[in-house]
Amino acid sequence: MPSTTQTTVQSIDSIDSIPTTIKRRQNDKTKTPKTKPVSKIPICPKNSSIPRLDQPSQHKFILLQSLLPITVHQLTTLVLSISRYDDYVHPFLLRLCVIIGYGYAFRFLLRREGLAIRTLGKKLGYLDGDHHPRDKVPRDSTRLNWSLPLTVGSRTVMCVLVAYDPSQQPINYLASLKWWAWLAVYLSLYPIILDFYYYCVHRAWHEVPCLWRFHRRHHTIKRPSILFTAYADSEQELFDIVGTPLLTFFTLKALHLPMDFYTWWICIQYIAYTEVMGHSGLRIYTTPPISCSWLLQRFGVELVIEDHDLHHRQGYRQARNYGKQTRIWDRLFGTCADRIETNPVNIQKGRRVMMHSINIPSLGN
């Protein structure tokens, strides 16, 4: 038998004979992996101060991105020297191109808003954060994967098929001061009328027992985030995505206030922005960017993020705050809930956050 000394020498010789590349791999395995620093989300007591999100900066954020596809649309017609589209392109192909272009722009706006909200959340925290974090994505999350494409695609197709007129170029509207004045009017009328239809059906889902099954999935989330904005049963998705916009469009038409394609497109972007912001749970005081927001605040019927957040935390029959754009109908029908964190005592009037000043990461991050 070889001695212990000989065995040790052989072991040392065998180690020395290992190629340097293998040694490096072994050394790399022993090294502790580098971990990225985790940014802690601030947890704020419910009685601590809360900042305001500037209203004009939200209009700037939405309008600039809403006008982007309209501008590209107009430039395309100028480059191709097309005065009347029907003479050059088949109407079906033309509408298909419009759907693709505006659909991509819709998705771009929502993703940028989502990134801005995520950035704000890391700095300011979330509502009810001292009690419970935001709910995580459930295991059965397949609906979340196609909820955004479904919303974007359905509303864009609806808008193009119902209101798009190929014979009218965007410049025919954008160059008119009257059109801009009416746009400001529609940015008040459209969300208020839409909110009436949503309030009625939403309240019925809660108070009529046989209708609750169409709304149950959306309420499995008690502390929502932007991912759960369109997380719902198929019946609710159909009503939210195309039902209320169509009812509002034809109501305005019946009132002799018809909307052109570009006005409706911009109004839809405003509605989608408010829907996402309302499910964000951000610990910030802000109202939906409605052109008459100052008037709603004067009468105490403005909506804030906490209103819908409290609605999700309440039970099946105990829920209140059914509105999603304003508090007009909740106030009229006595279904308002008291605010906890965004009460006037906590609001910091001197501390404002601007949407355009948020350092939004690139879409690839």
Curated annotation (Swiss-Prot):
It is an enzyme of class 1 (oxidoreductase). Its EC number is 1.-.-.-. It is a multi-pass membrane protein. GO terms for molecular function: iron ion binding; oxidoreductase activity. Residues 20-41 are annotated as: Disordered. It is found in: Membrane. Residues 189-335 form the Fatty acid hydroxylase domain. Glycans are attached at N47. Keywords: Glycoprotein, Membrane, Oxidoreductase, Transmembrane, Transmembrane helix, Virulence. GO terms for biological process: lipid biosynthetic process. Pfam families: FA_hydroxylase. It comes from the Eukaryota. The chain crosses the membrane at residues 62-82, 89-109, 144-164, 179-199. The keyword Membrane applies. Disruption phenotype: Leads to complete loss of verlamelin production. InterPro entries: Fatty_acid_hydroxylase, Sterol_Desaturase_Related. PANTHER family: STEROL DESATURASE (PTHR11863). Belongs to the sterol desaturase family. TMEM195 subfamily. This is Fatty acid hydroxylase vlmA. It comes from Lecanicillium sp. The gene is vlmA.
